[in-house]
Design a protein with these regions (language model features):
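Surface-exposed beta-loop interaction hotspot
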Residues: 9-12, 17-71
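Acidic-aromatic/histidine active-site loop/patch
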Residues: 140
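Alpha-helical adaptor scaffolds
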Residues: 1-3
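A contiguous, surface-oriented mixed alpha/beta subdomain in the mid-to-C-terminal portion of proteins
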Residues: 43-47, 53-135
């Protein structure tokens, strides 16, 4: 039987607390190490998902039309949005949580600030990890928000 990755950290916290309350400190070590490892993985995942590099592997998003509806709804609220591209990113850390890259393009005369990209990222469906990038004519002017 395989342990569900999403349950690993909460279960480790419960067992650590249980053994600690019983003063069985030698049994606590295993769960303390598991909690430390989970915290390290979360930190590495945040770093990995916070930027898009040239060698990163992008895959089809794999979402059904019904699963895309919240994405469409979130993006339709932003005036001047011309196009958007969504891809799933292949990640090394926390693979159970899908990581996406969303590239948005606005009308030519629209100024795109970091706060606007952050608003777009915040309006996306809950429970997803998505890097939002602005596509501009000049490569060096691209901005990104996690």
């Amino acid at each position: 039987m395989q342990l569900d990755e999403a349950a690993r950290e909460p279960c480790s916290q419960l067992l650590y607390g249980y053994f600690y309350s019983r003063n069985q400190l030698s049994r606590c070590d295993k769960y303390r190490q598991m909690l430390s490892q989970a915290a390290r993985e979360r930190k590495l995942a945040a770093i990995e998902r916070g930027e898009l590099k040239r060698h990163d592997v992008l895959l089809p998003h794999g979402l059904s039309p019904a699963e895309l509806l919240p994405w469409f709804a979130a993006l339709s609220d932003h005036k001047g949005l011309k196009r958007a591209w969504l891809a799933r990113r292949q990640v090394h850390y926390l693979q159970a949580v899908p990581a996406y890259a969303l590239v948005v393009e606005f009308a030519a005369l629209r100024w795109v600030s970091d706060s606007l990209l952050q608003q777009i990222a915040n309006s996306l469906p809950d429970g997803v990890s998505c890097l939002v990038l602005n596509r501009t004519a000049k490569r060096r002017d691209r901005k990104s928000v996690v």
